[in-house]
Amino acid sequence: MTLQWAAVATFLYAEIGLILIFCLPFIPPQRWQKIFSFNVWGKIATFWNKAFLTIIILLIVLFLDAVREVRKYSSVHTIEKSSTSRPDAYEHTQMKLFRSQRNLYISGFSLFFWLVLRRLVTLITQLAKELSNKGVLKTQAENTNKAAKKFMEENEKLKRILKSHGKDEECVLEAENKKLVEDQEKLKTELRKTSDALSKAQNDVMEMKMQSERLSKEYDQLLKEHSELQDRLERGNKKRL
């Protein structure tokens, strides 16, 4: 096995090991999420994406080269199998065909597991997020149920208290209503008396005003008569003199 195919085989074994580790049931997705959240992965994210695409391209090239080798030695294997002149050449070709087929499987499975590994990491990350959201939603639902039960219990207590004190409250309300009605009647009576007194006072004021006007007229008349009498007396005195 050449150096390049030894590296591809080692890469394939590493992929298989990583996939088996990711599939271990006792390691939860949240643990993998914490590992994937390390700052180291954020720093090498750009390099990682470029390396991922580069490895895919290399594996595709090796896979196509292996396909070419398989097709090449398959045709040669068929020709030399029918020929009996060189038996060693047939075995040599068969060995090369076996190696090319081995390289085809190694490169093909390496490419396949590389894509599966990338997809598996993505699914584990998504599953960890969904489980975290599920835990948060479960906690919120439990808190909501507890709050609802608490409110229902308080509501039942209030209903029982209202039922026990309902009769007393009705009696108190009736007494208050009766008192309000009596106060209303008293206010109406006082208002009526006040209105009558106000009307009477207005009438008295009008009468006093009329009397004052009559007295003013009589006073004016008396003043006029008094002045006339004085004039007469003055004339009589002048005649006597």
UniProtKB/Swiss-Prot annotation:
A motif (Di-lysine motif) lies at residues 238-241. Residues 206-223 have a biased composition (Basic and acidic residues). The keyword Endoplasmic reticulum applies. Keywords: Apoptosis, Coiled coil, Endoplasmic reticulum, ER-Golgi transport, Membrane, Protein transport, Transmembrane, Transmembrane helix, Transport. It comes from the Eukaryota. It is found in: Endoplasmic reticulum membrane. It holds the Pfam family Bap31. InterPro entries: BAP29/BAP31 (IPR008417), BAP29/BAP31_N (IPR040463), Bap31/Bap29_C (IPR041672). Residues 1-6, 65-103 are lumenal. It is a multi-pass membrane protein. The chain crosses the membrane at residues 7-27, 44-64, 104-124. Its main location: endoplasmic reticulum. One of its GO terms (biological process) is osteoblast differentiation. Residues 166-233 form a coiled coil. GO terms for cellular component: endoplasmic reticulum membrane; membrane. Gene3D superfamilies: 1.20.5.110. The keyword Nucleotide-binding does not apply. Residues 28-43, 125-241 are cytoplasmic. Residues 198-223 are annotated as: Disordered. Homodimer. Heterodimer with BCAP31. Binds CASP8 (isoform 9) as a complex containing BCAP31, BCAP29, BCL2 and/or BCL2L1. Interacts with VAMP3, VAMP1 and membrane IgD immunoglobulins. May interact with ACTG1 and non-muscle myosin II. May play a role in anterograde transport of membrane proteins from the endoplasmic reticulum to the Golgi. May be involved in CASP8-mediated apoptosis. Belongs to the BCAP29/BCAP31 family. PANTHER family: B-CELL RECEPTOR-ASSOCIATED PROTEIN 29 (PTHR12701:SF5), BCR-ASSOCIATED PROTEIN, BAP (PTHR12701). This is B-cell receptor-associated protein 29. It comes from Homo sapiens (Human).
